[in-house]
């Protein structure tokens, strides 16, 4: 599974990195972000593109798996 580590990055970088990873992915990707609004934006983006997004909150970060 490809991983995008966008922790500590400012918007719109996490979304741009996620979009690029999805474009080049052959399977699920995992995205790590540190802000709640980034998690929300990435989940919405994934769903708008027809993908399933599942998120988990970990200590001071969020993990989103996009399938």
Task: Identify the meaning behind each predicted range.
Residues 13-20, 36-49:
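Amphipathic alpha-helical interaction surfaces in cytosolic regulatory modules
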Residues 26, 37, 59-61:
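A generic structural motif
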Residues 22-34:
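Short glycine-rich, basic-tinged beta-strand/loop micro-motifs
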Residues 41-67:
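C-terminal structural segments of small proteins and small subunits
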Residues 1-25:
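An N-terminal amphipathic alpha-helical segment
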Residues 1, 28-30, 61:
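Intrinsic-disorder/low-complexity, polar/charged segments enriched in Ser/Thr/Lys/Arg/Asp/Glu/Gln
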